[in-house]
C-alpha cells in the first residue's frame, strides 16, 4: 500500500542502538520474561505503549517555558480549562497526573451516589487500569462489546461498538439502581484500538438516559475515534474533526482522559464534567488529598500548558491521517507476510492474534505474552500482551478469567518512528512466524495480586 510521508520536519533526534541476540536473551531472562521489566536501553524499537511516549511539537516545547508554577490559580490551568471547553464543550475541569488519577477520584463518587448496594459499571470494553479502579471501589466491571470484535480476521467498521441488546439486558439483570456508570471507551483498546460509531455512542447514551445512568467517556484516543467516524460513517465526511468531537461529547456526562495519548504529552490527565456541579465538587474534594490542589492535580504548570496546546494539535486532520495510515501500513505488511491480526487495524496499534499464531499454547500459558518475548528476542522490538495475563483473576473466586482474545499489541508512539521502522518491525514479526510452532508457554514465578502483568515474573514451561 502507499506510504504517507511524515507531515513534520525532525528538529531533534535520540540515538537508539541495536543489541545482539545474546544481549536480548540475557536481558529478558533478568527481567523475568516480562517486557515491562526490561530496561529501555535494552530495547531497539519500543512499542510497549503509545502513552506518554509521543514526541511533542515545537509549540508544546515553547509552552513548557511558559510554566506558571503557582500552587493555586495557575494561568496554565486557565488555558487548559479554556481548551477543554473549546474541544469538548465541558464546563468543569479537574487536571490529574494521568488517566488513572481521573478514575481514582471519579469512580468512588459515582458509587457513593447510586441508589443500589451492588454496584456495577458497564462498558463496551474496560481497559485494565479502568477495570482495576472499578473493582477497587467494590464494583464489578462488565463488558458488552459487539461480538464482531472477536472475529479478528473479518473486516467490520465498528468493532468497538456496544452490543446494545446486551447493554439493555445487563441493566435489567443488575437493576438500573446498581449501575454506577456506563463507560464508553473510545477507541476500544482491548478490542484492538477499534472505533465506536457515532450512532452507537448516541444510542448507548439514550439507553443510559432512559435509566438515569451517568455516561462516562474514556477519552484516551478520542481524536482517532473522530477520524474513523469522518472516514466511515454516513453524514460525517464533510464535518471537521472538532465538530465530530463536539457531537461525541454531547452524549456524555463526564470524561476521563489519559492525555498521554491523543493530546501527545508525556504526563497528564483530565476529569471533566459537562454540567453537574455536585459531582464536580465531589471530585474536587477527592482530588486534593489524592492528586493535588484542584488547579494543578499533580501536574506542573508547564505540563498543563503543553497539554492545553496538545488538545488542539491532536485534532489536526492531516496529522491524524498520517498517524492512522502509518498503523495501517504496518498491519498490511504483517498480513501480507501471513501474520494474523485484528482486521482492520485500529487507530494506535496493530494487534496480532496470538490464538491463531500460536494455537498450541492455551490461554492459561499466556500465548500473546510468549509471542511478545519472542518478538523482543528476534529484533529488540517491545510490545505488550492484551489477553489472559492482563485480564487476571476473578476477585471473588481467585480463578483465571477467560479472555476472549489473546492479542500482542504493537502500539505506535506519535511522531516518533518513521515508515522505515515499520518495515523493520514487520520483518521481525514475520521472522518469528517462521518458528511459531517451537514457542513455549509461560508460568508464574511471582504473581502480584492486582494488575499483575506490570510486575509479574515468569519462566518458560519446560
Curated annotation (Swiss-Prot):
Domain of life of the organism encoding this protein: Bacteria
EC annotation from Swiss-Prot or TrEMBL: 4.1.99.1
Catalytic activity entry: L-tryptophan + H2O = indole + pyruvate + NH4(+)
A Pfam family hit: Beta_elim_lyase
In-chain residues carrying the UniProt-annotated modification N6-(pyridoxal phosphate)lysine: 261
Cofactor: pyridoxal 5'-phosphate
CDD domains: Tnase_like (cd00617)
Alphabetized UniProt keyword annotations: Lyase, Pyridoxal phosphate, Tryptophan catabolism
Cited InterPro entries: ArAA_b-elim_lyase/Thr_aldolase, Beta-eliminating_lyase, PyrdxlP-dep_Trfase, PyrdxlP-dep_Trfase_major, PyrdxlP-dep_Trfase_small, TNase
Keyword Ribonucleoprotein listed: no
One Gene Ontology term of the molecular function aspect: tryptophanase activity
Catalytic class of the enzyme: lyase
Pathway(s) the chain acts in: Amino-acid degradation; L-tryptophan degradation via pyruvate pathway; indole and pyruvate from L-tryptophan: step 1/1
Family membership noted in the UniProt record: Belongs to the beta-eliminating lyase family.
Record text on subunit structure and interactions: Homotetramer.
PANTHER family assigned to the protein according to its UniProt record, in alphabetical order: BETA-ELIMINATING LYASE-LIKE PROTEIN-RELATED (PTHR32325), TRYPTOPHANASE (PTHR32325:SF4)
Protein name, UniProt field: Tryptophanase
Organism: Nitratidesulfovibrio vulgaris (strain ATCC 29579 / DSM 644 / CCUG 34227 / NCIMB 8303 / VKM B-1760 / Hildenborough) (Desulfovibrio vulgaris)
Record gene name: tnaA
